[in-house]
Amino acid sequence: MSEPRKILVTSALPYANGSIHLGHMLEYIQTDMWVRFQKMRGNQAVYVCADDAHGSAIMLRAEREGITSEQLIDAVRAEHMGDFADFLVDFDNYHSTHSEENRELSSAIYLKLRDAGHIDTRPVTQYFDPEKQMFLADRFIKGTCPKCGTADQYGDNCEACGATYAPTELKDPKSAISGATPVLKESLHYFFKLPDFEAMLKQWTRSGALQESVANKLAEWLDSGLQQWDISRDAPYFGFEIPDAPGKYFYVWLDAPIGYMASFKNLCARRPELDFDAFWGKDSSAELYHFIGKDIVNFHALFWPAMLEGAGYRKPTALNVHGYLTVNGQKMSKSRGTFVKARTYLDHLDPEYLRYYYASKLGRGVEDLDLNLEDFVQKVNSDLVGKVVNIASRCAGFIHKGNAGVLVGADPAPELLAAFREAAPGIAEAYEARDFNRAMREIMALADRANAWIAEQAPWALAKQEGQQDKVQAVCGLGINLFRQLVIFLKPVLPKLAAAAEAFLNVAPLTWADHRTLLANHQLNPFQPLMTRIEPAKVEAMIEASKEDLAAAASQPAGNGELVKEPIAAEIDFDAFAAVDLRIALIEKCEFVEGADKLLRLSLDIGDAKRNVFSGIKSAYPDPSALEGRLTLYVANLAPRKMKFGVSEGMVLAAGPGGEEIYLLSPDSGAKPGQRVK
């Protein structure tokens, strides 16, 4: 028998400045299912995580709420832990990056990098808010685009024309925190010499540690040459002070991944069988996996392994990268009620419904996953209630009525039982490869076979016939054993259902190896309903409650620590407005722009003509194809603008503060391409 594997697993650290939503839960459920499978197989799998608790955003929110940053992150951590626990995510440890373990490790790693010559310093000139007495990151500066003249744009890019620029190029800059006019000020910054590790990273990213598509994307960065990474921020800042630099703090992305190590170290202090160096030492034979979203690949696949290498630690065995969550084929939307917080979901629906649905759609690739709410209801009701639970509910009553609840050990269908046993290695292989959707398909195919066989045997009809009681017990006994097999296969996904089934079956917690055995002459406990069907009305209630969450947030005082209230622009007369030719446009094609961080290329049909537009909305629409076929509003008479990537022939209209919160405007149903907006 082979030795159990030593496996350390992490999920990305959620930021301690907001609630967990269903997009976040995709990753934690995916990771939890994989870890539970490993533990069922007898491996020493350890799952750690923590709140990412540093940065200006946290400091500013705490200030706005009149509490300390520590009080804020403690409250948010408690909220996060409650959400994860109720979604049955079973961390071995859930810590915080604002911990002594993380302070010690961050300082030690920095000093090792410094002593090895991997740290550089140089002066940096940037905007400074004279009222708040703090340097301003790009997102904390707003002003007029130096390229197209659009007001109220961020400090690094224009969402109107897609131009990128330095914050110092912005016209009429204002602090988005205080509204004050910022001044330029010089400060000494600390840099990690990432180019020192270019050769190592080129090898490591092609070593099998990454999905091929991720490795290909990183190759673009590596081939264009790596730049030094700014790892310092000036006071005031909520974080850890750099050991040899008073008033300078580690940038949040330096100490955040070290939080994985810190959480594990915190666990080691409570579990003597765990040795920190056995998992993190340079020559560790343990496996280390990071489950992350595709938006933070660069930090985990470039900066993080370079830091570990430079400080004398091991590198990850692999990064398991997943895509984004969409709902009903579109980006999660607060106004449509599809931006659903974890707690709002839990207030209305069973967490195992979502765990199963995610499992049924999650593959090992980086593709986005769509939560189609109609399909969600149908799939859960059909698969879990109509197939799996149905087997037990069909058979249990006959065993209790006809044999006092004792399950006999007969095997009236050896070929069917053999099919279940023969399927186990393939299902295990799918779990191991994170091909959860394949595992669910194979499990449900077995459930279909079991239900078809039971229907063919018709124990309900046999029970009415003289002399058929032994056959009824044999059929139903095998039915319960097949149900037990399915529960074993589904336990990583449905731990609560599995626990209820174990209570009914009157057995100890099931392991993966238990699929090789059968219950025989075994006393069952009375059967209780294991799962109920999803009522569509409850899904609708969840959507409405999510809209109420938005309304409640909108009723709060304006401002989130990053933005000041946006004033109404200067008054114009009707002729000035009428000069803008707004048209309905059909998005025929939408695609990424090679080499552009923020742009999408939209091919538009405006009725009697085609137009090509570049729009800075990539951060909000990570899957461009989701926009294809949509109608939007288009400025048709804006002068064409020559850009680095081609000519942009007009502009599409969107609302929102930027980043992920950009909302492309759409007309009401019935509008046609080319119609003028009046």
Curated annotation (Swiss-Prot):
<dbReference type="InterPro" id="IPR033911">
    <property type="entry name" value="MetRS_core"/>
</dbReference>
<comment type="function">
    <text>Is required not only for elongation of protein synthesis but also for the initiation of all mRNA translation through initiator tRNA(fMet) aminoacylation.</text>
</comment>
<dbReference type="GO" id="GO:0004825">
    <property type="term" value="F:methionine-tRNA ligase activity"/>
</dbReference>
<keyword id="KW-0547">Nucleotide-binding</keyword>
<dbReference type="InterPro" id="IPR015413">
    <property type="entry name" value="Methionyl/Leucyl_tRNA_Synth"/>
</dbReference>
<comment type="similarity">
    <text>Belongs to the class-I aminoacyl-tRNA synthetase family. MetG type 1 subfamily.</text>
</comment>
<dbReference type="InterPro" id="IPR002547">
    <property type="entry name" value="tRNA-bd_dom"/>
</dbReference>
<dbReference type="InterPro" id="IPR041872">
    <property type="entry name" value="Anticodon_Met"/>
</dbReference>
<feature type="binding site">
    <location>
        <position position="145"/>
    </location>
    <ligand>
        <name>Zn(2+)</name>
    </ligand>
</feature>
<feature type="binding site">
    <location>
        <position position="161"/>
    </location>
    <ligand>
        <name>Zn(2+)</name>
    </ligand>
</feature>
<dbReference type="InterPro" id="IPR012340">
    <property type="entry name" value="NA-bd_OB-fold"/>
</dbReference>
<feature type="domain" description="tRNA-binding">
    <location>
        <begin position="576"/>
        <end position="678"/>
    </location>
</feature>
<keyword id="KW-0694">RNA-binding</keyword>
<feature type="short sequence motif" description="'HIGH' region">
    <location>
        <begin position="14"/>
        <end position="24"/>
    </location>
</feature>
<keyword id="KW-0479">Metal-binding</keyword>
<keyword id="KW-0963">Cytoplasm</keyword>
<feature type="short sequence motif" description="'KMSKS' region">
    <location>
        <begin position="331"/>
        <end position="335"/>
    </location>
</feature>
<keyword id="KW-0436">Ligase</keyword>
<feature type="binding site">
    <location>
        <position position="334"/>
    </location>
    <ligand>
        <name>ATP</name>
    </ligand>
</feature>
<dbReference type="InterPro" id="IPR029038">
    <property type="entry name" value="MetRS_Zn"/>
</dbReference>
<dbReference type="GO" id="GO:0006431">
    <property type="term" value="P:methionyl-tRNA aminoacylation"/>
</dbReference>
<keyword id="KW-0820">tRNA-binding</keyword>
<dbReference type="GO" id="GO:0046872">
    <property type="term" value="F:metal ion binding"/>
</dbReference>
<dbReference type="InterPro" id="IPR004495">
    <property type="entry name" value="Met-tRNA-synth_bsu_C"/>
</dbReference>
<dbReference type="GO" id="GO:0005829">
    <property type="term" value="C:cytosol"/>
</dbReference>
<keyword id="KW-0067">ATP-binding</keyword>
<dbReference type="Pfam" id="PF01588">
    <property type="entry name" value="tRNA_bind"/>
</dbReference>
<dbReference type="Pfam" id="PF09334">
    <property type="entry name" value="tRNA-synt_1g"/>
</dbReference>
<dbReference type="Pfam" id="PF19303">
    <property type="entry name" value="Anticodon_3"/>
</dbReference>
<protein>
    <recommendedName>
        <fullName>Methionine--tRNA ligase</fullName>
        <ecNumber>6.1.1.10</ecNumber>
    </recommendedName>
</protein>
<feature type="binding site">
    <location>
        <position position="158"/>
    </location>
    <ligand>
        <name>Zn(2+)</name>
    </ligand>
</feature>
<dbReference type="InterPro" id="IPR009080">
    <property type="entry name" value="tRNAsynth_Ia_anticodon-bd"/>
</dbReference>
<comment type="subunit">
    <text>Homodimer.</text>
</comment>
<dbReference type="InterPro" id="IPR014729">
    <property type="entry name" value="Rossmann-like_a/b/a_fold"/>
</dbReference>
<dbReference type="InterPro" id="IPR023458">
    <property type="entry name" value="Met-tRNA_ligase_1"/>
</dbReference>
<dbReference type="InterPro" id="IPR014758">
    <property type="entry name" value="Met-tRNA_synth"/>
</dbReference>
<keyword id="KW-0030">Aminoacyl-tRNA synthetase</keyword>
<feature type="binding site">
    <location>
        <position position="148"/>
    </location>
    <ligand>
        <name>Zn(2+)</name>
    </ligand>
</feature>
<dbReference type="GO" id="GO:0000049">
    <property type="term" value="F:tRNA binding"/>
</dbReference>
<keyword id="KW-0648">Protein biosynthesis</keyword>
<dbReference type="InterPro" id="IPR001412">
    <property type="entry name" value="aa-tRNA-synth_I_CS"/>
</dbReference>
<keyword id="KW-0862">Zinc</keyword>
